Amino acid sequence: MVTPEKLVSLALEAMDRAYYPYSGYAVGAALLCADGTVYQGCNIENASFTPTICAERTAFFKAIYDGHREFTAIAICGGKGGKIAGAFPPCGVCRQVMREFCEDDFKVYLVNGKESYEELTLADILPHSFRPREHMQD
């Protein structure tokens, strides 16, 4: 079983792989699939900014490519120069990607330090969200 603490540790490890020459912010994420598999992601920046991808989406897209569709938790960490200075919440685009594949009770661990984190849910960070079922055809 992957504990929240292990997920946090894997997010911190992923942050070390970030490519962030433009913003100066390194971000790492560790995504827990329902079957216990963990996917790590980091932010990867680009000079034109639009093709930049966040750590959370990197982890999700790797997992989705490998066939996973059910997720239980994600740990996210980040900070200027790769130094954690407090919780680093996901951007709006990443929250909407989470909504596409996760239920309200999906756990979101925002890392505050090497050994501390804040536990939230998707419902906490994305209330009144636009859900995939609103697009579904009968």
Where are these regions (language model features)?
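Basic/polar N-terminal segments that are highly enriched at the extreme N-terminus
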Residues: 1-5, 136-138
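Charged, amphipathic alpha-helical segments
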Residues: 4-9, 91-95
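Short, basic/aromatic recognition patches
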Residues: 5-20
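Small-residue (primarily alanine) positions within well-ordered alpha-helices
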Residues: 11, 29-30, 59, 63
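Short glycine/serine/threonine-biased micro-segments
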Residues: 22-26, 39, 90
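Short beta-strand scaffold segments in enzyme catalytic cores
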Residues: 24-32, 109
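Zn2+-dependent cytidine deaminase-like catalytic core
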Residues: 40-134
